[in-house]
Amino acid sequence: MIDLAKVRNFYIACGYTDLRLGIDSLAAVVTQQYGSHLDEESLFLFCGRRTDRIKALYWCGDGYILLYKRLSNGRFQWPRSEAELRLLDPQSFRWLMEGLRIEQKTAIRKGKPKDLF
């Protein structure tokens, strides 16, 4: 089974991917189109034209796992402008899964402690 704690690299295929593709075809997209390879530390995410569903491909050591998520409300904030494989950090992956943009324009800035006296 998939253990997200073991996943170190979250990759998203920017732009559109045909979600009719299965395990073998998506693995071919990863290796041939993007020149990457599947391993136990990497999870690859794909999104079609309808941004309410995504597929994820993961190699678990003895076989592939294909995950499919369809939102009942809302849409994923998926980057569309580039046809590339982009590496996400765990926080950006979490934002994406929560429906937020992976590139937040604003955030609470870190501050310095102030003297109270």
For every predicted segment, state its role:
Residues M1-F117:
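Polybasic/polar functional segments that serve as interface/processing modules
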